[in-house]
Each structure stands twice: as C-alpha cells, then as structure tokens.
Amino acid sequence: PNPALQQGAEGEDPAAQGPEPGTPQAVYTPPDVPKTKGTLTVGFGRFNPPHAGHGQLMDIAAGSARDSEEGSDYMIVPSKSEGKDTDPLDFGTKVEAMKGMFPHHSGHISEDENFRTIIDVLKYAHNQGYANARIVAGGKRVKQFDELSQKYNRALYDFGNLETISSGDRDEDGEGIEAMSATTARQAALDNDYDTFSSTLPTDEEGNDFAGEEDLF
C-alpha cells in the first residue's frame, strides 16, 4: 500500500481557517473591482485522499453554477495541506488523482498551491470580478465555513450575496455515497485492505474502476 495513506484519522480542516495572524481588518477594504461576473461556486476541501463521495460535492457545485445567473462558474479547490496524518498525499498526487477520478470536472479543479484557506479563494473570486460567491461544504462543515466567510465579507472581499450550502451529511452506518469518507480510505490502506479501499473510489460510466487506484493504494 501507499505508505503515505497508512496514516491517521479525521482532523480539523485547514481550509476553514481565517487569514494569517496580523491581517488588518478594520483598516482594510477590498480592492475596488468592477463586478462583471455572476456567482462563483467553490468546493474547497482536503480531498485526502479523494473518493467517490467527493463526486457529489463537485456535481452540486457544477449544478449551482448552471442554475445561477449569466457569468457564473464553479471551481474545486484542494487545500495545500500535506504531510500530516490526516493529509498523507502530497498536493500534486492529490490533484492528479482528482482529475483522473472525475474527468468531467477536470477543467474546474484548481492546481493553484496558493489557495491555502477558503479566505484565499474568496479574495481571488472578488478580484476576478464575481458579484456573489457560494461555498459547498460537507454537512458538518457548513456552519464553520459560513461563519468564517461572513466574518470577512466587506473587509477582505465584497460580495452582494455570500452563502454556504451543504453537499450532504455523511452516514457512517449507511451505504453508498453517504457512507464514504477519506478516513475510511486511509484506514483501509493502513489495514492493507485493498477491497475496502477500492470500494471508496468512483467508477466510470461503464462501471470500470479508476485506472490509477493501484498506484494510489
């Protein structure tokens, strides 16, 4: 098995952190950027390792962009965090796996290593001229992302509408997508349990396994 995956359990999401200490707030206002675009929907997470459940988050982000006003788009942003028990895969390996697992979203998966937190992404969206922003997060992260993002609106970025929506709740006792988790995949690698690890990964439209799953394991 991939030695990197033979590590820890779930932890805090570094994506849901505020700006670096010392970032001015009261005296800082966002750059004055013409709002020429609609809504940017952002799916931000560790994706470490990526699994079938993440496809649901990406589909929701894509659907949100389609249903929004003209000039809207979506982006999937993997965090840069790596090297800890909960983040065993390096950034490049993670992005490559995500693009291979979800080819229909490949063009929307960011390779920018400067996006360390959701705040970085929202500042980018503001500077790109988006009038609104929407964050897609797992059920238990929604409140955390919403409170953090709202805290810095009008200070580090400026959106007329800023909201966080859920990609769904994970049911550890359930089956299918709702039961998928990166923790399960990491534990399967730790236990050298290839079958369970494989079951967490998506298949293509013909039901074929992800081509890179043996290398990822």
Give the role of each language-model region.
Residues 1-26:
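Extended, compositionally simple fibrous regions characteristic of intermediate-filament-like scaffolds
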Residues 18-217:
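Nucleotidyltransferase catalytic core that binds NTPs
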